[in-house]
Amino acid sequence: MFRRPRSLRRTSRKEPAVTSHHLTDRHRAALPPWMPLSYTDALEIVSGRGRTVRGGDGRDYLDFYSGVAANMLGYDVPQVREAIERQLRTGVVHTSTFYLIRSQIELAERIGRLSAIDDPVAFFTCSGTEAVETALLLATEYRRSRHVIALRDSYHGRSFGALAVTGDRRWQGAGLTPLSVDHVPGGPVRADAGEDWVASCTRRLTRVLDDAAGPVAALIAEPVQGVAGAAPLADGQLAAYARVVRERGALLICDEVQTGWGRTGRLWGYQWDEDVRPDLLVFAKGVAGGLPLGGVVGRRDVMSCLPMPSVSTFGGNPLSTAAALATLDLIEERDLTTRALHTGRALRSLLTGGLHGLASVRRVQGRGLLLGVAFQDPATAGPSAAVARAVQEKCRENGLLVGLGGTTGHCVRVMPPLTVTDDEVRQGAALLVQAAREVDQHWRNS
């Protein structure tokens, strides 16, 4: 039997369900149409504690999406809250990078040590998109080339350059770009892809590099393709790519926006393969416990190549970096990286076993606590966004929040906070399995 999420402490806030419709109308009137909302009846989250949130509908939900992985430690974390409040009491929320910021310097030193990059230097931004854009600027300037290689089905952000290297077909052709971009294979379609797949991918990358008219700036890669539905690269694929790129003098940019900080069961997703050493590493999402913070850490010679002075007005601000230091303290003190490995294996096993035999389920994929369930139409065996959406809706009915992804929208994304308990893993898995079984039964009977 599964249990509903435990109740949060009641507040004086009025939370009538009817307000969501009015708020949705205001959202659609004031914000662009390309900002989608989850669920037929859109949800407002009004409070949270641990891994449980309360919606504007008055219901409590177990959150297995974590604000798209940004609420990495969950909600109302005392140590992070205290670090933020301590900084707020100084009266200084922002100064800009024209001034010394102690917490920014301490965080840069710490991330440099954790990156495993030789002689590292860090630069802070406000988001993963901005961090990717910075990495592309550095790589193209360092190599004096605007030619970048990226992976198919990847997603790197919604800015000019980040969209150019994004390999997800839904975002291609969205606008002009100053970059020349080639795409090589990302994660394999089959879960059992092995050495033959890696060899084929490596040959494709080699041809692109050898056929280039001039130097190639970089290869940018996600170790696990998050928006694609938590699709990991095959074992050895990133290492093979890194070797070929290094032999030809191009840089390796690892986009760890979703995979960083222990979520995959390694501190960095690139560490699932041996002999991978990125030249530039991009991070964001959960590093500041839910506050906006991103950045790039990389080799000193690459990070020092810009010919003009540059600043980041809000990147690395005192408030976000104070929260980030507290977040990293908790990751290390509680060994959340190892915990993500073990709880991720348990969650994946529960999902795989519970979903076995369902005609609408393709596979469970991912690493650690970055997981995806791929769905298909039982009649055609083609990927089905409609089935995935129905499962997401049914999960909410059951009291569980999950996300959507996949190159055709056919995946349910499962990314609970790294602090998720064993009981919550079992509870969340049971709720998702129940939802998928109900949808599968309905789909086969319709």
Question: Which sequence ranges carry the predicted segments?
Answer:
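Conserved N-terminal phosphate-binding loop of PLP-dependent enzymes in the Aspartate aminotransferase
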Residues: 18-446
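Short, Lys/Arg-enriched N-terminal segments with co-localized hydrophobic residues
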Residues: 4-17
